[in-house]
Amino acid sequence: MSSSRPLNGLSRLDAEDRSPYQRLSQRMLDISGDRGVLKDVIREGAGELVTPDASVLVKYSGYLEHMDKPFDSNCFRKTPRLMKLGEDITLWGMELGLLSMRRGELARFLFKPTYAYGTLGCPPLIPPNTTVLFEIELLDFLDSAESDKFCALSAEQQSQFPLQKVLKVAATEREFGNYLFRQNRFYDAKVRYKRALLLLHRRTAPPEEQHLVETAKLLVFLNLSFTYLKLERPTMALRYGEQALIIDRKNAKALFRCGQACLLMTEYQKARDFLVRAQREQPFNHDINNELKKLASYYRDYMDKEREMCHRMFASGDNGSTVGEN
């Protein structure tokens, strides 16, 4: 978000008795057609415009005129919540504004009361009939409607679409999973990854395009392996890690995940085999080398406990047995 004040110093009435918002509005673009929503781009974005049914990831701050501190902001959150247009966003002006934005864009908007809090406002925070200013940064957006509609089709219906469509929808599902994973919502992330995998499994591609499907599957297998580790289900993590290795037997990330899973299952020799192979591919990888150190430490503890248990068993047999005595 912009580190400067929202009005860039426009805090006093000018010679013509125009308010700061009136002065600011003179250089802003009308995107509603009635000057109810005005826009000033601070930083240009890139790519496509936000689609009407998208889920958006944004940072925003809302200001009242003559006030430097926002009355509403989500910038304090480490990871903003994903919001769906038409459902989670209550300001009409913000929705229209977002539809005019591209990924990475930072913009300033003025919303007239009709597009904000109406003639009544929102007491005591928002006075009646108030124009508000919002600074909005579009971090990312996902076209969830396209994905949801496609996933609702039967396998036969999906097969009528070109491969690129399937790959795009699968990628969207995976991106949703990644977002949920970053929110520590591992179960929900797993559901999205499995939806992506189902789409890719259903699709039969011609030989010259099969590598595209395999590449997409590899990413999902790696995501699922990591997610199951987070869910403390190492058997499933190992299964998906091994599926990734079928596609790319030297994939360091897949070898690493398999090693982690085996370590959690106390299968130390298998864990070592996977981790050594991973280290061979990426000898200076900090995570792999640390996992090998952890494995060595766990194995030492395991062997110490085994020796101690054996010692106690034999000691008990020598001192406490009466078998064969008269």
UniProtKB/Swiss-Prot annotation:
One of its GO terms (cellular component) is cytosol. InterPro entries: FKBP6/shu (IPR042282), PPIase_dom_sf (IPR046357), PPIase_FKBP_dom (IPR001179), TPR-like_helical_dom_sf (IPR011990), TPR_rpt (IPR019734). Residues 53-142 form the PPIase FKBP-type domain. One of its GO terms (molecular function) is Hsp90 protein binding. The keyword Acyltransferase does not apply. Co-chaperone required during spermatogenesis to repress transposable elements and prevent their mobilization, which is essential for the germline integrity. Acts via the piRNA metabolic process, which mediates the repression of transposable elements during meiosis by forming complexes composed of piRNAs and Piwi proteins and govern the methylation and subsequent repression of transposons. Acts as a co-chaperone via its interaction with HSP90 and is required for the piRNA amplification process, the secondary piRNA biogenesis. This is Inactive peptidyl-prolyl cis-trans isomerase FKBP6. Keywords: Cytoplasm, Differentiation, Meiosis, Nucleus, Repeat, RNA-mediated gene silencing, Spermatogenesis, TPR repeat. The keyword Ribosomal protein does not apply. SUPFAM superfamilies: FKBP-like, TPR-like. Interacts with HSP72/HSPA2 and CLTC. Interacts with GAPDH; leading to inhibit GAPDH catalytic activity. Interacts (via TPR repeats) with HSP90. Belongs to the FKBP6 family. The gene is FKBP6.
